[in-house]
Swiss-Prot record:
Lineage: Bacteria, Bacillati, Bacillota, Bacilli, Bacillales
Domain remark text: The EIIB domain is phosphorylated by phospho-EIIA on a cysteinyl or histidyl residue, depending on the transported sugar. Then, it transfers the phosphoryl group to the sugar substrate concomitantly with the sugar uptake processed by the EIIC domain.
GO MF entries: kinase activity; protein-N(PI)-phosphohistidine-sugar phosphotransferase activity; protein-phosphocysteine-N-acetylmuramate phosphotransferase system transporter activity
Transmembrane segments: 118-138, 154-174, 181-201, 210-230, 250-270, 281-301, 325-345, 355-375, 399-419, 423-443
Record keyword Secreted present: no
Annotated catalytic residues: 30
Subcellular location: Cell membrane
Name this polypeptide is given: Putative PTS system EIIBC component YbbF
Amino acid sequence: MSKENNYHHLAQKILELCGGKSNISSYTHCMTRLRITPYDESKADAQALRKLDGVLGVVEAETLQIILGTGVVNHVTAAFSKLVSAEEGADVKEAAAKKKADINRKNATPFKLFLRKIASIFIPLIPALVASGLITGITKAIIQAGWLSADSQIAIILTVIGSGLFTYLGILVGINASKEFGGTPALGALAGILIINPEIAKISLFGEELLPGRGGLIGVLFAAIFIAYTEQFIRRFIPQSLDIIVTPTVSLLITGIVTYVVFMPLGGFISDAITSGLLSILDIGGIAAGFILGATFLPLVVTGLHQGLTPVHMELINSIGNDPLLPILAMGGAGQVGAAFAVFVKTKKTTLRKAIAGGLPSGLLGIGEPLIFGVTLPLGRPFLTACLGAGIGGAFQAYFQVATIAIGVSGLPLSFLVLPSQIILYIVGLFISYAAGFLLTYAFGYKDEMASQFD
């Protein structure tokens, strides 16, 4: 069976175990997970989904999150989309709409909705950030090693290719933010341009000249969300024949004025507070701060709250050019790898060893969900010892102030995104987390009596 057929077969089985296409309210995907919102949750068989070949784990939260891994999730989602796109009967749609409204009311807590919006804005940008970050990082490493002159045309071309995204990132954030809040994507792009336009330097307000980029991605978010709501409000009063001319023009004019008077200063204040606050925590807290941040990241992953950190990482890179937080948090996955390997060594249960063997390769490559949801979390104590191991590695990263130049998956691949002069330090910290997670779990974290579910 070809790979495409495998993806189609897996998508078909997932759809069946989620209650069929008439039970699918909505679906999307991130880097590793297919996220499905069923109309009727009772029709989705999470246990059966976990047993499917190709499924690395299942998380039952406000959405049904099926962990498939990087790369695979794109193909399976595409196949899944084709399967659910067939037209449904009107009676099914009517009943489904009522059920969807009930589910939305149940899940529509402000905090969950906020995280969902944030994820939808920033997660689609991660592949571009990884690509640009890798090209930039590798180019800097080659130049630093003396293999290429910084003034050579090859180095200049590679630098331009890698840096372009970070120059115009505000435009992409504006597009996604406006679309997410019901506006026109092109107007969202204009909201981003309002912040990064070099001509801003000619504007002087309240006795001070404006700085291009001031407000950062926070300012872009404010402007893009504002222009989306402004557009919707104005459209209510404009005749359809004039809508295409009046609505975008007035929306842009109002948003531009409000952006320069309010959003840029406010966004700049918040951006400075986030950046200086985190840097102060790491500077003052040092090893202790690194330990706490590293040890508490995995519980955030379990609850899905880690998605809220994506704009923080981006803002750090946008503001100071690097991210000292990501290497610390990346130790969470490394602690899991060490803990899972300790269980693998100690256990005599074939089913458990098979589950660990399947999850370790992806864990080493920065995809920790299979080990978290398939091994350490169900066992209980190994999850805690993994967190402690992660904290020890996080303390190491904080002490040496290791930072990345872009965001991406953790584990070994993140070493390509670390500042070239700190790659060895990052890898050392990674292996410290592996070792700490292993030793703590081997000594205190596991007995075969804990694994009755793997009999």
